[in-house]
Amino acid sequence: HDFSPHKSDNVAMVEYDLQNRVSKEWLPAVMNAHGAFQSTESVQSASRSSNHDVCPYVSKFYESNPLSRETAIYGAGGNWYANSKSLNYVYLTNSGIGGDLTCKRYRVSDGGDSFSQDGFYAEGELDVVKTIDEDGHIKYDFKNLYGDIVLQRTVGNENHDTYYLYDYRGNLCFVLSPKASSQLGNATNIGVDNNSIVANLSFFYKYDSKNRCIEKKLPGCEPVYYVYDMYHLPIFSQDGNQRAKGQWAFTAYDRLGRVA
């Protein structure tokens, strides 16, 4: 309301279908409404005029079943619609061994500092979302029964796989980059301390008994350590450069837990 020097309103509109799902999201329009209610038709006309486009809205399409999952999204702008360029989703499950729908199974040790490959996930054990972008590029997201992503696969001349490894409490412990996952082979009890591929090409996170991250290691970097107070707030941190100098960074909080 009256957002500009000329006291014009910035008006945006969202349309819903009969099942209360978002069907169109219109780009904002400049209107001399002074906070008054505007009809659907007037907002649509103003949006087309303000954005100089016949289709200044994002359109969403859904499955015709009770799950109502998104199947296609068209971006704002007439060129997307004129050229039938949309973001498309296909919902699948993983296959056993072989093909784009296979996924390695990794087991993280109880201590959380090493892992081993344990074959492949059984057929149908993972939910898979296949995404096809406006240029035809394909990506697969594999999720376990807890909804955690265990693999993101980008399809090209060669597949590029990013694996996400969790401990038995559901904490993310390792992220294996595509180069790391392609070079590791059949990994057995390896981690950042005994494998250069993991140390240089992967992300590592370590947790205490309260599921607080106490160590974080980025690819090719020295680890960062974290220390918490009795309220689970991080008060000390130390990276590799600070460790070489015997230094720690300190964070102070007020009585409401805000950084002081």
PLM regions and their residue ranges:
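Beta-strand elements of repeat-based all-beta scaffolds
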Residues: 1-260
